[in-house]
Amino acid sequence: MTHQTHAYHMVNPSPWPLTGALSALLMTSGLIMWFHFNSTTLLMLGLTTNMLTMYQWWRDVIRESTFQGHHTPTVQKGLRYGMILFIISEVLFFTGFFWAFYHSSLAPTPELGGCWPPTGIHPLNPLEVPLLNTSVLLASGVSITWAHHSLMEGNRNHMLQALFITIALGVYFTLLQASEYYEAPFTISDGVYGSTFFVATGFHGLHVIIGSTFLIVCFFRQLKFHFTSNHHFGFEAAAWYWHFVDVVWLFLYVSIYWWGS
């Protein structure tokens, strides 16, 4: 490390990949225990260790990038490629869910009554809460772009305001989605309609929670003056992720809520 003559970051040995893998094992085992034996002990242990791992791992990355200067332009380029590939992998995840939905809805089987939505299913009105959710996410896309432009112009206060608005809209979306699930006239066990609806929208909702967490971390980092107009990849990655979540929701709204109803 002392005599390094290249622009790459040679990472020091870290325990977090190991603790992260163990926490993932605990979480998946805990889910099975919860589903089959109604015991949440293992799941809670897995979630706790996962949160602790993420906190400490991200803390180390922030130290390396912001305070130690290890994230050179070459390293940032690699991180950009990594984030792009990660988002592409997420696109493929959602492609699978849309495939399942269209496979079931374009050629409904006789067991479903030969129609879509299946006989006995009362779909949600796309012009009520789903339309409000769409407006909320589109507004958050505008505010995150405002935050990015403010950062590039060196306007710290506007950046913080825009970021706070984006986080608030993300939390509002999650609350609206939770209320919609609570009041839905069908469940995940109501045949293929219930399973495709809840898996696709639930997976998207999980991504909104992850994206909101990402933005909250960026908000606190900006409070501590971590970002500059030419060194802010953490925020840029969060913004990319948030726009991805926006676009996926538009496809979900048009496919499942509007056309599918």
Swiss-Prot record:
What family does this belong to?
A: Belongs to the cytochrome c oxidase subunit 3 family.
The beginning of the lineage is: Eukaryota, Metazoa, Chordata, Craniata, Vertebrata
Query: What SUPFAM superfamilies does the record tag this protein with?
Result: Cytochrome c oxidase subunit III-like
Q: How does it assemble?
A: Component of the cytochrome c oxidase (complex IV, CIV), a multisubunit enzyme composed of 14 subunits. The complex is composed of a catalytic core of 3 subunits MT-CO1, MT-CO2 and MT-CO3, encoded in the mitochondrial DNA, and 11 supernumerary subunits COX4I, COX5A, COX5B, COX6A, COX6B, COX6C, COX7A, COX7B, COX7C, COX8 and NDUFA4, which are encoded in the nuclear genome.
Spans through the membrane: 16-34, 41-66, 73-105, 129-152, 156-183, 191-223, 233-256
Q: Name the chemical reaction catalysed here.
A: 4 Fe(II)-[cytochrome c] + O2 + 8 H(+)(in) = 4 Fe(III)-[cytochrome c] + 2 H2O + 4 H(+)(out)
Membrane-topology annotation of the record:
Multi-pass membrane protein
Q: Which UniProt keywords apply?
A: Membrane, Mitochondrion, Mitochondrion inner membrane, Translocase, Transmembrane, Transmembrane helix
Tagged with keyword Disulfide bond: no
Q: What is this protein called?
A: Cytochrome c oxidase subunit 3
Q: Which PANTHER family match?
A: CYTOCHROME C OXIDASE SUBUNIT 3, CYTOCHROME C OXIDASE SUBUNIT III
The entry's function note states: Component of the cytochrome c oxidase, the last enzyme in the mitochondrial electron transport chain which drives oxidative phosphorylation. The respiratory chain contains 3 multisubunit complexes succinate dehydrogenase (complex II, CII), ubiquinol-cytochrome c oxidoreductase (cytochrome b-c1 complex, complex III, CIII) and cytochrome c oxidase (complex IV, CIV), that cooperate to transfer electrons derived from NADH and succinate to molecular oxygen, creating an electrochemical gradient over the inner membrane that drives transmembrane transport and the ATP synthase.
Q: What is its EC number?
A: 7.1.1.9
Q: According to the UniProt topology, which residue ranges lie Mitochondrial intermembrane?
A: 35-40, 106-128, 184-190, 257-261
Record the organism. Ourebia ourebi
Name the Gene Ontology biological process terms.
mitochondrial electron transport, cytochrome c to oxygen; respiratory chain complex IV assembly
